[in-house]
UniProtKB/Swiss-Prot annotation:
Keywords: Antimicrobial, Disulfide bond, Ion channel impairing toxin, Myotoxin, Neurotoxin, Potassium channel impairing toxin, Secreted, Signal, Toxin, Voltage-gated potassium channel impairing toxin
Gene3D superfamilies, alphabetized: Anthopleurin-A
Family membership: Belongs to the crotamine-myotoxin family.
An example Gene Ontology biological process: envenomation resulting in occlusion of the pore of voltage-gated potassium channel in another organism
Keyword Cell membrane: no
Protein name: Myotoxin-4
Leader sequence residues: 1-8
Record's function text: Cationic peptide that possesses multiple functions. It acts as a cell-penetrating peptide (CPP), and as a potent voltage-gated potassium channel (Kv) inhibitor. It exhibits antimicrobial activities, hind limb paralysis, and severe muscle necrosis by a non-enzymatic mechanism.
Disulfide topology: 12-44, 19-38, 26-45
């Protein structure tokens, strides 16, 4: 199964997040979703929205 370019991390993106290196701290009020479907030693962080 090959995903389309840019859609490699569907689970993370569905939650509105992006993959970051594991060392990055997700600063509140961002959410840290953990690894999700990001690559090894990365994690999914959702940056706070402007709403």
């Amino acid at each position: 199964f090959l995903s389309e370019p840019g859609n490699a991390y569907k689970q993370c993106h569905k939650k509105g997040g992006h993959c970051f290196p594991k060392e990055k701290i997700c600063i509140p009020p961002s959410s840290d979703f953990g690894k999700m479907d990001c690559r090894w030693r990365w994690k999914c962080c959702k940056k706070r929205s402007g709403k």
